[in-house]
Each structure stands twice: as C-alpha cells, then as structure tokens.
Amino acid sequence: VWCTAYFLFDFYCDFEEKLLLKSQLLHPEILAALAGGGHGAQVLIADGNYPSSTHAAPNARRVYLNLAPGTVSATEVLRVIAAAIPIESAQVMQPADGRDAPIFTEFRTLLPGLTLEPLERFAFYAQSSVPETCLVIATGEQRIYANILLTIGVIPPP
C-alpha cells in the first residue's frame, strides 16, 4: 500500500498540472503513513506545545505542519484526516482540573458518533509512545490541550 502512495506522489510530482487525488488530503508523507498504518494504528495530532520529539513512538513518521503560531491548526488537520480514513476511537489529553478543554467541542463536531476518551497528561504521553503510533503531525495550534490521538478503524466490505 505504501508503494501505491509513493507511486501517486511520484506521478503527481511529474504531472503537477493534473490533480491526481479527489481527497482533500494531498500531503504525500501523511498519505504514505496512513496507507501503511492499517487497522489499529494510531495517529497523533499534536498542538504547538506538545513535545513530539520525546513523547511519541520513536519509529512514527513525523510531519511538521507548524509553520507559524496558529498555522496549521489541529482542527484543520483533524477535518482532513477524518475525511480520509475511518476512525475507530479518539483519545484526548485532559486538563489537570478535569474539565474539558474548549477545543474538545470542535473535536466532537468533527468526529460525530465518537466519544472522546480523556487521558491524564502522562497517560496520554505513554499512549502516544506505543509502537502502534505510526504518524505524528505537529501543528501550529496555540490552544492548550489541543492534542488528539486517533485509532484507525476499518472499512467494512460492501
């Protein structure tokens, strides 16, 4: 599957005037990581404060979209990822006071039918560091506790 994503990327680079994918997701490294991930793999969308170099699986592919503060946002990334893959579950880093972070409302809107599972900060770090985490996307999101860990689901047969 990774070879297919690489072929598409290579083909796209050769013929830039043609849009090859119908999806909103066009980033070649993210496409390759998702294609290689499969059912049960995890994707971390990290805010601008998340220590993604030290608190994520060492073998996970890292994509840095944190061009500037606020760009690209965690919700922009989640919207595109959620449209591209089936999502089985979602975990969030819960603030120390136990309340929901304001961004959780937006996460719920983007993931209808899923319950956000809150994890204490260090439990979230531990879960993000398991070998099943195949992709870490560092965003420029400035809102705190805007980290979400997605588990890739399955597409049922027709």
What are these model-derived regions, one by one?
Residues 21, 25-29, 38, 69-76, ...:
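Conserved active-site and cofactor/substrate-binding residues in soluble primary-metabolism enzymes
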